[in-house]
């Protein structure tokens, strides 16, 4: 399902079947996070059918070590700069795989809108 998004205008590929679309650009000369970086981000997560399962909007941004997130986030966020806002399409095997999570059936393609606010 994530590969179907690749046909849409403005959608670009990343490794391992992940795709993204730039919604807003930060400063291109900013540093990129590494897996050991602590990233601060606002996000909204949806399944491929559009059902929202999580969001930090209207609350406190997520602040976490990047390597503690799902592989799809790790791959995508290492390409982002502070101020970037992307819609990221993550195939199940780069998300939660065959395992269900609250509000997410096993085997689900995930769509995250991620805005990178900071890197430490």
Q: How would you describe each model-predicted region?
A:
Residues 1-120:
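Cross-family detector of peptidyl-prolyl cis-trans isomerase
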């Amino acid at each position: 399902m994530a590969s179907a998004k690749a046909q849409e205008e403005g959608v670009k590929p990343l490794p391992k079947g992940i795709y993204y679309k730039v919604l807003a650009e930060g400063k291109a000369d900013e540093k990129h996070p590494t897996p050991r970086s602590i990233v601060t981000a606002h996000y909204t997560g949806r399944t491929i059918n559009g059902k929202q399962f999580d969001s930090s909007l209207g609350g406190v941004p997520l602040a976490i070590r990047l390597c503690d997130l799902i592989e799809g986030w790790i791959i995508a966020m290492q390409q982002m700069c502070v101020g970037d806002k992307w819609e990221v399409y993550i195939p199940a095997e780069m998300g939660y795989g065959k395992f269900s999570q609250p509000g997410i059936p096993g085997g689900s393609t995930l769509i995250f809108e991620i805005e990178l606010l900071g890197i430490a």
